[in-house]
Amino acid sequence: MTESVFETRKLSDIYDEVREVYLSDNRPWILGFSGGKDSTCMVQLVWNAISDLPENQRQKKIYIISSDTLVESPKIVEQITDTLSKMEKAAKEQNLPISTNLVRPEIKDSFWVCLLGLGYPAPSNNFRWCTDRLKIRNADRFIT
């Protein structure tokens, strides 16, 4: 039998830690959401932890952002947009300080402008220009 290198923790302890960190300062939180299992789990942990706080302690704003790279399948974009909309509605109904935002690259940073217009090579493991231009810059623009 293999022992885990990860500390075994109760879910209630994780919720307590999230609440403690949330209440420790007044800086807003920005959570990246892709719709995958990791970001979905993170949003759910934060959501559940903050929901248990009294309403007068839910003062810090939480922004959930997702990147529309403008090259995703329309079904993927529809799924993310629908999920963000449902989160936004539920946050309002539950009086949570959570808002959702879909960020997109500027035209000059879009995949097709870079690939066809500027002659960038197709992204590869050695040259991943698309991650910065299609996701990171948009999140940075939202933050600032």
Feature map (PLM): residue ranges:
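ATP-dependent adenylation/nucleotidyltransferase module used to activate substrates
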Residues: 1-144
